[in-house]
């Protein structure tokens, strides 16, 4: 995907990943931040916000009222293509983690890894 090609981004990592998402979002795009796994810091400039009108919107997953939360889950259940979701997830066993870690660190893994701690 080309730089400044994204209309919207959902980021659950924070830090440099969130800063890069803002930098790569097109004019009028929206970036949502819902996690800080990498860092709570935002090492970015205000350029995407000023020059392209990018919006950074926080997602409250802790204190959000139950009404909107239930509505969001209902919409996901209705609209999510489960076959597409399954293509984004690779299940590995806990015993596989050390072998997969170098690929994760090298950026060779796409999607999400689901670790089965019983394997």
Regions found by a protein language model. Give the residues of each.
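N-terminal Rossmann-like NAD(P) cofactor-binding module of classical short-chain dehydrogenase/reductase
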Residues: 7-10
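Conserved NAD(P)H cofactor-binding loop of Rossmann-fold oxidoreductase domains
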Residues: 13
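C-terminal hydrophobic helical "lid"/dimerization subdomain
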Residues: 70-119
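Short, small-residue-biased leader/transition segments that mark boundaries at the very start
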Residues: 1-3
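Glycine-rich phosphate-binding loop and adjacent beta-alpha segment
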Residues: 16-82, 117-119
């Amino acid at each position: 995907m080309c730089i400044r090609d994204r209309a919207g981004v959902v980021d659950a990592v924070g830090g440099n990943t969130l800063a890069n998402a803002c930098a790569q979002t097109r004019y009028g795009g929206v970036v949502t931040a819902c996690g800080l796994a990498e860092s709570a810091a935002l090492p970015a400039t205000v350029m995407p916000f000023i020059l392209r009108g990018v919006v950074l919107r926080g997602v409250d997953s802790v204190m959000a009222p139950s009404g909107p939360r239930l509505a969001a889950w209902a919409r996901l259940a209705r609209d999510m293509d489960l076959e597409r979701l399954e293509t984004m997830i690779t299940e590995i066993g806990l015993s596989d983690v050390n072998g997969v870690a170098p690929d994760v660190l090298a950026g060779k893994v796409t999607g999400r890894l689901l670790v089965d701690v019983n394997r």
